[in-house]
Amino acid sequence: WPRKTALLVLMAVFTIGNLACALAPNYWTLMAARVLTAFAHGTFFGVGSVVATSLVASDKKASAIAIMFTGLTVATILGVPFGTWLGQHFGWRATFWAVTLVGVVAFAIIALLVPASKDAPEAFNLREDLAVLKRGPVLAGLLTTVLGWVGVFAVFTYLAPLLTKVTGFSD
């Protein structure tokens, strides 16, 4: 797929996944939708990094990636407390409705502002691409990254109780 199309599809999957979370009739549907959004989210940032670097001069590539990931950082810093506030005041589904709305806006922004790639999509061989996972150092690096991010996001689970019950912050 062309890169812009890939970004749009991934954002659509992410948005639909969050909509499914907001409408989930039971726990297992919620978890399945969360897994769907996780795959789309991670892949989106991989493709987004490639798109960001393709839009700027060689000496600006690192800055382009930094700017793109600043959005993720800001979303984490502001979105987690805001989502918690929404959930506490309007119910947990409100948080997923809010993220769905953000996804719709992001989809529109991508559609309007990201230029279409002039280059044809690169051909790929899935078997060759996955063969790199047979190399120990690559697998170790990937596992380290996954475990690191699992740790980061696990902390978010306990952050609110830690702040309210241990340090005495109010809800």
What residue spans do the PLM features occupy?
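Extracytoplasmic gate region of multi-pass secondary transporters
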Residues: 139-171
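Cytoplasmic helix-loop-helix junction between adjacent transmembrane helices
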Residues: 27, 33-71
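A generic transmembrane-helix signature of 12-TM secondary carrier transporters
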Residues: 11, 15-18, 33, 100-107
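Conserved MFS/SLC helix-loop-helix module at the cytosolic interface between two early adjacent transmembrane helices
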Residues: 1-25
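Hydrophobic transmembrane alpha-helices of secondary-active solute transporters
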Residues: 37, 41, 72, 106, ...
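Helix-loop-helix hairpin linking two adjacent transmembrane segments in secondary transporters
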Residues: 25-29, 58-60, 67-112, 158, ...
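Juxtamembrane intracellular "pre-TM" segments in multi-pass secondary transporters
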Residues: 114-144
